[in-house]
């Protein structure tokens, strides 16, 4: 099978590869939803086995943090195929290709998610399941959007913690989902050809005053909380700051985006949508025989 990845590179991939290495959680997520267990995966934070993958990553060879995978450990896993996040691996393309056929996806925007899932499902020999997963998500997104209150549009922000928080434009996968539910993203849309995120100072945040803030949890270090402006934000005062799991960071996979949809709905409209049990939702999508 010959495919074109998000680098625009044409890759000859083996038929029904059995030994999948995942750089980022995207391919791990897709593989699990297809009933396949990868042989190697990166992590977001060492020792943090994400609930949206049912903690199953601890049974898989860990090959380092997603931004700096260890190529020696990757090679030891003897993969048939490597599925990677483009921006973290494009500089190592040559070394990766020596280990196994290397496929790179952007994994950044909701508009790319269906295509990435369907192509990877095809590569992994389960194209019908990929089509089903995409159709189910589109249906769920429409149902949740229809059920969301129409008279409120909570201002929201999705950010990586830091002294100057990095915030995500509306096309980014999680922000797209929150916006589809009626949220109003203070970071606004992407500029044509620009990046999918932007640095917003706490001063700017105070001016735009988000009512709900989703923070990608990079661990116990939360420098933004030490800034006196932080305490003045509406979201902080009303207790609507949510430190979210790794599925929000890696939301393009079928399991992650379904759970983000449910959590976002609950966090925006707690009266309308129930609290989410992440593991229970994940278990609906991960076949019993690989758990």
Annotate each predicted stretch with a short phrase.
Residues 215-291:
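Structured C-terminal subdomain patch of bacterial secreted/periplasmic proteins
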Residues 6-8, 16, 25-26, 36, ...:
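Solvent-exposed coil/turn segments that connect beta secondary-structure elements
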Residues 1-26, 128-159, 267-291:
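Bacterial Sec-exported substrate-binding components of ABC uptake systems
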Residues 19, 25-73, 77:
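A short, structured surface patch at a secondary-structure boundary
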């Amino acid at each position: 099978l010959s495919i074109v990845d998000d680098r625009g590179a044409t890759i000859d991939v083996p038929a029904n590869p059995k030994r999948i290495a995942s750089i980022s959680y995207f391919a791990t997520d897709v593989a699990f939803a297809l009933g396949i267990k990868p042989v190697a995966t990166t992590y977001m934070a060492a020792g943090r086995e994400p609930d949206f993958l049912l903690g199953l990553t601890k049974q898989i060879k860990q090959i380092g943090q997603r931004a700096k995978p260890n190529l020696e450990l990757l090679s030891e896993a003897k993969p048939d195929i490597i599925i990677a996040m483009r921006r973290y691996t494009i500089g190592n393309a040559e070394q990766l290709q020596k280990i196994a056929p290397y496929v790179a996806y952007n994994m950044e925007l909701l508009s790319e998610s269906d295509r990435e899932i369907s192509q990877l499902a095809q590569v992994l020999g389960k194209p019908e399941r990929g089509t089903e997963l995409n159709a189910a998500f589109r249906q769920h997104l429409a149902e949740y959007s229809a059920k969301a209150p129409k008279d409120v549009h909570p201002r929201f922000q999705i950010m990586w913690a830091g002294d100057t928080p990095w915030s995500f434009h509306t096309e980014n996968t999680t922000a797209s989902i929150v916006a589809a539910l009626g949220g109003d993203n203070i970071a606004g849309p992407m500029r044509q050809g620009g990046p999918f995120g932007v640095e917003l100072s706490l001063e700017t945040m105070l001016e735009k005053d988000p009512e709900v803030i989703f923070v990608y949890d990079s661990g116990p270090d939360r420098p933004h909380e030490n800034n006196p402006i932080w305490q003045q934000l509406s979201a902080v005062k009303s207790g609507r700051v949510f430190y979210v799991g790794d599925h929000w960071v890696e939301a393009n996979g079928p399991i992650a985006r379904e759970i983000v949809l449910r959590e976002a709905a609950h966090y925006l409209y707690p009266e309308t949508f129930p609290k989410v049990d992440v593991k229970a939702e994940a278990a609906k999508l991960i076949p019993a025989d690989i758990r």
